[in-house]
Amino acid sequence: LTAVKERAPKAYLNEKFLTSPEGRIVRILSEYVEPRARLAHANVKDTIVFFGSARIQSPEEVEAELRQLKNAQALAAQTNSLSKEVAAELEEAIRRAKMHKQLSRYYEEGAELARLLTEWSITKAAHDYEKAQVARSQLAAAQVREQIPYVNVESIKTHSFKQRYVICSGGGPGIMEAANRGAMLAGGKSIGLNIALPFEQMPNSYITDELNFEFHYFFMRKFWFAYLGKALVIFPGGFGTLDELFECLTLIQTGKIRKKMPIVVYGTQFWQKIIDFEMLEYYGMISRQDLSLIHFSDTPQDAFEYIKSELTRLDEGEETFLQSNPHA
């Protein structure tokens, strides 16, 4: 008897192929098509993106860490059980924890800003839907009255979902967690675009389940930040935050992103110590006009009012364009 040969795996189920160098193009496309399908199903069209450090903890977490370190230091002093090297490391850990305590206000303020934006976004979605319904009725009446068969009543965009703008973060701890937390406190949905890292950045618990994503490729993750983003908020952070800020600024400066996108740089004192934007302009590395791409802010209320006014202005401009260009 001839032995029955096992079926070969289908290509799209062949894990060995999918994880090989030859399967890279499929993996890249998957990180475009799968998020696109899920976001469309959730009716997410516009986001407000929060960038910032994963290391900025909540005041409660920092206080607990600092207390634990000080207790360890006190116990070691009583027993004289630490070497000079370990004692110096403990002292440095306490110094860092004290610095993190100063920065922890950004966690609270990030959560508050996300809450304010989400509450406004939910209210705006309902208001926009009502306006769109009126506009549709008026267009339909005009179409009959004036006998204009080509007027497309559906050209008036509606945002019938419950949230006009959805808060989007990198999905991890720190400022990312604060953003998702604030959105949840407001009763809204929020997105987490996580990234697989060697030290395992786990998704925070405040992300909406169906909007929790995990990326392998940084550039595909960045694409979704930029593509859906209608406003950016940059909180204090390290290399990753700097990379995200400057990539978005470069795309806007060079016209690769053609949409108007308000950018709030949050924490003036921190950022002016890290980057001297004025000196970049002084040396001619950027233009004076480029400085207008950034709005510095130091309170949730100021950042909220700026983003709200800018997005409202841009939204009304789009609405006017659509009403005057029914085939757009």
Model-flagged regions — what are they?
Residues V265-A328:
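C-terminal functional extensions of proteins
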Residues A40-N43, K157-K162, M184, N204-Y206, ...:
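Solvent-exposed alpha-helices and their adjacent loops that cap or buttress functional pockets
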Residues T2-A11, E15-K189:
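Glycine-rich beta-alpha loop segments
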Residues K189-E200, F235-P236, L249-F277, R288-Q289:
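Short, acidic/small-residue loops that bind anionic groups at enzyme active sites
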Residues E112-I122, L245-Q253, I275-E281:
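Short, well-ordered amphipathic alpha-helices
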Residues C168-S169, P173-F235, F246, W271:
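Phosphate/pyrophosphate-binding betaalpha-module
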Residues E65-Q68, M184-L185, E247-I252, M279-Y282, ...:
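Short, solvent-exposed amphipathic alpha-helical segments in soluble enzyme
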Residues E61, L242-F246:
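Glycine/threonine-rich flexible loop motifs
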